[in-house]
């Protein structure tokens, strides 16, 4: 993946909750979350797995996507992920059946 990319990503936590975030290095950020060094929310919900990621040209765009996603209900979040999977707009997506 390009080093100048900005990503909005969604993690599936061990308790089946979803965590949304921003990063410019997906692999490093996922590793950080699973080492317990990431966000406080994910520390108690490990292990986490990547279930969705989208690439953006700017940090601002990625963070706006994260903000909009966080405003959705759980059902709408799952629909959003499924819609992106079908349209192939996402960099990485697990299907809701894989949650």
Curated annotation (Swiss-Prot):
Ranges of residues in domain GIY-YIG: 4-79
InterPro entries named in the record: GIY-YIG_endonuc, GIY-YIG_endonuc_sf, UPF0213_domain
SMART domains: GIYc
Superkingdom assignment: Bacteria
Family designation: Belongs to the UPF0213 family.
Protein name as annotated: UPF0213 protein RBAM_000440
Lineage: Bacteria, Bacillati, Bacillota, Bacilli, Bacillales
């Amino acid at each position: 993946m390009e080093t100048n990319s900005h990503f909005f990503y969604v993690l599936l936590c061990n308790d089946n909750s979803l965590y949304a975030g921003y990063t410019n290095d997906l692999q490093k950020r996922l590793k950080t979350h699973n080492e317990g060094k990431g966000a406080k929310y994910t520390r108690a919900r490990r292990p986490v797995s990547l279930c969705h990621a989208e690439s953006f040209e700017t940090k601002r765009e990625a963070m706006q996507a994260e903000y909009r996603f966080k405003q959705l209900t759980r059902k709408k979040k799952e629909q959003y992920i499924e819609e992106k999977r079908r349209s192939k707009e996402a960099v990485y997506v697990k299907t809701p059946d894989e949650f």
